[in-house]
A protein has these predicted regions:
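Amphipathic, alpha-helical segments enriched in basic
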Residues: 4, 14, 32, 73-76
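Ser/Thr-rich, low-complexity intrinsically disordered terminal regions
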Residues: 14, 18-63
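Terminal, regulation- and interaction-focused segments at domain boundaries
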Residues: 1-27, 99, 109-111
Length: 111
């Protein structure tokens, strides 16, 4: 795995070379006070009001570095969704969100 790639579960992603800042904003990313772009989406089993955590995606200001984390409800503690078979629907939701970002040409899946 190269330096600018992120592995989450069995998937590896990188920044799409044709990424634009306006595309990040259109996809729901917000710019932090430090200039990086952050996307946070709840992860849940049955109800979006009963979350088990969040996927947190950060892109640096120069659009060259990607970070993807699954975190608990406090948005700070890292959680591993891939160890528990009961969380497979949550893993499917995570994959759906990541596939949406691939479709929007924000990230690319490394094969």
């Amino acid at each position: 795995m190269l330096k600018n790639q992120v592995k989450i579960g069995n998937w590896t992603y990188k920044i799409n070379p044709s990424i634009k800042k306006y595309a990040l904003r259109d996809a729901g990313f917000t710019q932090t006070t430090h200039g990086e772009f952050r996307y946070t989406h709840p992860l849940y089993l049955d109800s979006p009001y009963d979350t088990i955590g969040f996927v947190k995606i950060d892109v640096n200001e120069s659009l060259t570095q990607l970070d993807i984390l699954t975190v608990g409800n406090d948005k700070m503690t890292k959680i591993n969704l891939f160890k528990n078979k009961k969380l497979q629907p949550v893993v499917d939701l995570l994959k759906f969100n990541l596939d949406d970002l691939v479709e929007r040409e924000i990230i690319s899946e490394v094969k």
